[in-house]
Amino acid sequence: MKRRNRAYRLLRLTAVYLLLLPFLLLGWLYSRLPDRVYLEPGQALLLPRFGWVEPMGLHGSQNAASTQVVGSYQTTLSLGGWLPIKNIRTVVTERAQVTVCGTPFGVKMFSEGALIVGFSDIDSPGGSTVNPAKAAGLRLGDRVIRIGQIRTENNDAVKEALEAARGSAAEVIYVRSGEQRSTTLTPVWDAAAAQWRAGMWVRDSSAGVGTLTFVDPEKGVFAGLGHPISDGDTGESIALRSGEIVPCEITGCSMGTVGSPGELKGKFLSAHAIGSIRINGENGVYGTTRTGFSGQTMPVAFAQEVETGEAQILATVAGETPRTYHVCIEKISDANPRRNMVIRVVDKALLTRTGGIVQGMSGSPILQNGRLVGAVTHVLVNDPTRGYGIFAQTMLEQAEQVATAEK
């Protein structure tokens, strides 16, 4: 009897799972499908990565996804043309053409506020050690934007504000994790340094080397890196006050190994800016330029056109001239906008030279079927032959926002 009851419960549980399975699969599919799709006029909506998914009405009524008219439309994606899964936005637009670069560039950025990158205790007149910044609750990575009545736009302004307080409590306005906060800090006199101090080290600027992905010469905008410029000590994305890009050449490379990513080494060739940075965002560095850049004019692929399989990257690992290297796109995903692709380097020349993907190659264009499909963003620390990439379409959208703002 007990055995029969156990079998009955198991059968009932199995039936429940079987009933829930289709809904779970539809939920998974919903989360994987894009929210927006771009098409050329007259181009039908095809999703190669989801061959069984197609727009509703494909077998009957007009398919808005293949309209000839430029504009934005709502499209219902379905399973086999009959079971609705998700409503998405279909944008019909002319395909963009950009100058694909792959050239190195130097970055000089000044942050909005002074970033806390370290702490050091101070010997007080009473003989004990104190740290006013820590006592005020400040942390590594906080961005100080005002002390007292003085805006702390740079390191000198922080020093000036502490001198102005002269040991009195001063209100500190700072930003942590995107949220503005306030606290009170009381500077102490450092007899050894002969100045008022808070016990914190701050940084107001950053410099580095990256790779230029593309330039739109008609709109006068550029895109690079594919990820934000972050502070080397805190890992925090730098809030942009102003910035520029300058000519650069690659002078050396440390090879990447398992657990230790390699790095391109470069030097600035000139102090003359070739572009102004307008955005330091999650999807890269974007700005304006009137400089003519060498490169090949190529169409930008829509996200749904990117395929797994053979591809190429344009990367500069020596000097100023990019070369084409063979890679394989192993995985594609719409779920994480900063990690749309997993790519693997298969080019023997690049593997011999760098060990795979190294720091400084971020922004290297990914090409497939004669189109710009994306850019390299990160290396997998435990496997330097592999890395992540971002869709070129995403970077183009951000660059077009810069162009619109400059009008």
Predicted regions and their residues:
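Interdomain regulatory linker/hinge segments that flank or connect interaction modules
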Residues: 2-3, 56-100, 278-325
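Hydrophobic membrane-insertion alpha-helices, especially the h-region
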Residues: 9-28
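PDZ domains, with a preference for the canonical peptide-binding region formed by the helix
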Residues: 66-68, 146-179, 383-385, 390-393
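PDZ-domain C-terminal substructure recognizer with occasional recognition of PDZ-binding tails
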Residues: 77-79, 86-88, 92-94, 159-199
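PDZ/PDZ-like groove recognition
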Residues: 110-135, 139
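A short glycine-leucine-enriched loop at secondary-structure breakpoints
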Residues: 129-143, 166, 356-360
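Conserved PDZ fold ligand-binding element
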Residues: 133-156, 366-369, 373-378
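Serine endopeptidase catalytic core focused on the charge-relay Asp
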Residues: 184-359, 368-369, 377, 383-398
